[in-house]
Amino acid sequence: MAYHSFLLEPITCHAWNKDATQIAFCPNSHDVHIYKKDGDKWSKIHELKEHNGHVTGIDWAPESNRIVTCGTDRNAYVWTLKNNVWKPTLVILRINRAARCVKWSPKENKFAVGSGSRLISICYFEQENDWWVCKHIKKPIRSTVLSLDWHPNNVLLAAGSSDFKSRIFSAYIKEVEERPAPTPWGSKMPFGELMFESSSSCGWVHSVCFSHSGDRMAWVSHDSTICISDATKKMRVTSLITDTLPLLCVTFITENSLVAAGHDCFPVLYIYDEAQGTLSFGGKLDIPKQSSQRGMTARERFQNLDKKASSDTNNITLDSLHKNSISQLSVLSGGKAKCSKFCTTGLDGGMCIWDVKSLESAMKDLKIK
């Protein structure tokens, strides 16, 4: 596992380019920094400055090499690289609250933006007018949209929001794509059609994710639950109440395996059993070093109380690689079908790249199916 600390500021969101040689992230500010790997070091090569509010979402299209960003200024920008300079194009989202998340569609001909306006903006490029326009998905969203993920068919869109619901909508835009083929989630897909709505969550839905096939959707909530809906099993929902602090992000790494992370500062593996319809804990992927678990002596305890007016509980350092909450997960190589590497960024200003095979060999009982 390779860990790199970029800054002291928290990393609120990130995105990788196609060959995973460059990473774009927001250091909890109005700007986006782009770093390039140079041997074992990372060097800053670009700084994107256009937003006048905190950047809340970044996505990097692998084929067209365009970056889309959104922020609390209620705007989105599409960035295009010309002569080694990133040029922004403003996208009017027609919202009156902060944008919270953004995702390119698989075919990169549109993108979705979730916001505090209780709606999702589906943005696409109009060739005739030479600008980006958007359509809104509103009903039945009743609160801020916190996370988005596209189905592989480029039409269905998963959304998690702070009204305790995860949903799947049709984001079919007839101007830019052909009529979609039927899926296990449904056959009729006019724009804005609600294909699925969860009822099992009792907390804000922080993250949603489709599997590689698109037949399963997973989500994590602030009540420390992780859930999966399987469209091939009549949209059966399987949930697991975890013993961790709330999870903030989740991704499939195979069709039956998921990695999630959040306030516990380490990634966790979960296994879905299709036959049994169960979700189980697969193991912690960041084992603490036992040598550093030494207790304090009575003398040290009283010295701390005398000098710092603090107890020993305030002086325990985390043994995980990340020293603060993990805010985002992304698959680096192998895709969601058979991930070989994934990346985490956190509020400690650090980024870690995890090698799946190395994790399997380092942990005896770990089996990723």
Swiss-Prot record:
Keywords, in A-Z order: Actin-binding, Cytoplasm, Cytoskeleton, Nucleus, Repeat, WD repeat
Keyword Cytoplasm: yes
GO biological process, one term: Arp2/3 complex-mediated actin nucleation
Keyword ATP-binding appears in the UniProt entry: no
Molecular function per GO: actin filament binding
A Pfam family the protein falls into: WD40
Subcellular location: Cytoplasm, Cytoskeleton; Nucleus
GO cellular component, as recorded: Arp2/3 protein complex; cytoplasm; nucleus
Domain of life: Eukaryota
Signal sequence bounds: none
Repeat positions for WD: 6-45, 50-89, 94-135, 140-179, 200-239, 242-282, 321-364
PANTHER family: ACTIN-RELATED PROTEIN 2/3 COMPLEX SUBUNIT 1 (PTHR10709), ACTIN-RELATED PROTEIN 2_3 COMPLEX SUBUNIT 1B (PTHR10709:SF10)
Function in brief: Component of the Arp2/3 complex, a multiprotein complex that mediates actin polymerization upon stimulation by nucleation-promoting factor (NPF). The Arp2/3 complex mediates the formation of branched actin networks in the cytoplasm, providing the force for cell motility. In addition to its role in the cytoplasmic cytoskeleton, the Arp2/3 complex also promotes actin polymerization in the nucleus, thereby regulating gene transcription and repair of damaged DNA.
Protein family: Belongs to the WD repeat ARPC1 family.
Quaternary structure (record): Component of the Arp2/3 complex composed of actr2/arp2, actr3/arp3, arpc1 (arpc1a or arpc1b), arpc2, arpc3, arpc4 and arpc5.
Protein name: Actin-related protein 2/3 complex subunit 1B-A
Organism: Xenopus laevis
